[in-house]
Amino acid sequence: MTNPQPAIEGGISEVEIISQQVDEETKSIAPVQLVNFAYRDLPLAAVDLSTAGSQLLSNLDEDYQREGSNWLKPCCGKRAAVWQVFLLSASLNSFLVACVILVVILLTLELLIDIKLLQFSSAFQFAGVIHWISLVILSVFFSETVLRIVVLGIWDYIENKIEVFDGAVIILSLAPMVASTVANGPRSPWDAISLIIMLRIWRVKRVIDAYVLPVKLEMEMVIQQYEKAKVIQDEQLERLTQICQEQGFEIRQLRAHLAQQDLDLAAEREAALQAPHVLSQPRSRFKVLEAGTWDEETAAESVVEELQPSQEATMKDDMNSYISQYYNGPSSDSGVPEPAVCMVTTAAIDIHQPNISSDLFSLDMPLKLGGNGTSATSESASRSSVTRAQSDSSQTLGSSMDCSTAREEPSSEPGPSPPPLPSQQQVEEATVQDLLSSLSEDPCPSQKALDPAPLARPSPAGSAQTSPELEHRVSLFNQKNQEGFTVFQIRPVIHFQPTVPMLEDKFRSLESKEQKLHRVPEA
């Protein structure tokens, strides 16, 4: 597999590079000149002297090297090309044809006068004038023949049979006239032999070719240019075909690789197109992601993506509402989020011992909105150990409350399932649920506690009426907790004092005090 050409800056593909090269090569093609420009192929019309002269000069050295053409020439070099174009021009050939017709007419009249078929008063004087005019015209023809031999070369002139015949006709016409004139004077019937000059009328063909050959030669030059361009295009086509074959082979390899990986491109494309519509639908506050087994590494990573809550689930971020919920249950002016599983841990509010790894006691229970408040339908206890980093950033992260939705894998450790709760303890569960919901709704209780903003404490009357009842309910819940978890001896995790404690003391009292059982070794 050949390496394709490197891509140019700007991400230009290889096909565009090749097309640009083809355009440049096409523009750089010079006008094609004729090769082996022989005398018989020269046009007889007025040709561009620059083009024809340059071609003739390029072949001039080859003409000089021929045998028998080294004799002295009066017109050589660039003048030879100019004279050659002049001798082959259409204007000269037209003039020569006209002279041939004229000399034939004059010789015919002279012959008629000499044989006395044409008689008038001054016939003999007129015949003498016609004789000298015909002799001058034949002399011009002879001079033109000599000039052709000198300019074209003797061997080129001899190779052209038509030119040899034309020269012979001129000599046979001129020689008898000169001889009769010297012997008998202008009045001699032998002048009729000069009528052989009529054979030179064939130059009419040269005049016709003078208007046809230029067009023919021009078309031949254009054809040669197109043939060269065709050769270049064929080469480019072969290169492009090879590139297409290579790319097709790579595409087949990639498709085979995707088929081995069981990747469905159509399904992925449809899923990507449906993603904006799925994200635009209203959802709960949190989104559960597939995170696999919940261990220390996945616990440290953010596997829960928070989405924007709906307007119905928006709650007031006010400490007064949290305090009122803590004592009186959920307030009427605060919204309750849709059912979700919240994991409430005691390490979320452990802001006093950031460098000590604490055992977590978590309760996973779905929250439901009931007529009198939130009611718990199921309760499962799971223990996990999370080691927090000993840094300032870890203290800040550790102080935030963990109220994220997660999927808990079933525990591999066998243990007795908790017995079903009797109906008499629903009041206790509702109380504990109120406490957990109030804690789960606060995203960052430590920051609220450190906030210097004034807090509205509950009225003494309300607190006096509520605190003993809450203390009694919490004590009952702690007893039930110890009875329910027979395997894990857990001490009460929530303690209340008879008097109304400060907010900071409440958070400190919620710290975990259970025994460190089944610790996971740190990595």
From Swiss-Prot:
PANTHER family: TRANSMEMBRANE PROTEIN 266 (PTHR46842:SF1). Residues 116-121, 183-191 are extracellular. The transmembrane segment S4 functions as a voltage-sensor and is characterized by a series of positively charged amino acids at every third position. Transplantation of the transmembrane segment S4 into HVCN1, generates a functional voltage-activated proton channel. The coiled coil mediates homodimerization. Keywords: Cell membrane, Cell projection, Coiled coil, Disulfide bond, Membrane, Transmembrane, Transmembrane helix. Residues 398-411 have a biased composition (Polar residues). The lineage of its organism: Eukaryota, Metazoa, Chordata, Craniata, Vertebrata. Residues 421-430 have a biased composition (Pro residues). GO terms for cellular component: cytosol; dendrite; perikaryon; plasma membrane. Gene3D superfamilies: Voltage-gated potassium channels. Chain C (1.20.120.350). InterPro entries: TMEM266, Volt_channel_dom_sf. Residues 1-94, 143-161, 213-523 are cytoplasmic. One of its GO terms (molecular function) is protein homodimerization activity. Homodimer; disulfide-linked. The chain crosses the membrane at residues 95-115, 122-142, 162-182, 192-212. It is found in: Cell membrane; Cell projection, Dendrite; Perikaryon. Residues 380-477 are annotated as: Disordered. It is a multi-pass membrane protein. Disulfide bonds: none annotated. Residues 382-397 have a biased composition (Low complexity). Voltage-sensor protein present on the post-synaptic side of glutamatergic mossy fibers and granule cells in the cerebellum. Despite the presence of a voltage-sensor segment, does not form a functional ion channel and its precise role remains unclear. Undergoes both rapid and slow structural rearrangements in response to changes in voltage. Contains a zinc-binding site that can regulate the slow conformational transition. This is Transmembrane protein 266. Residues 218-270 form a coiled coil. Mainly expressed in the cerebellum. Also expressed in cerebral cortex, skeletal muscle and thyroid, but at much lower levels.
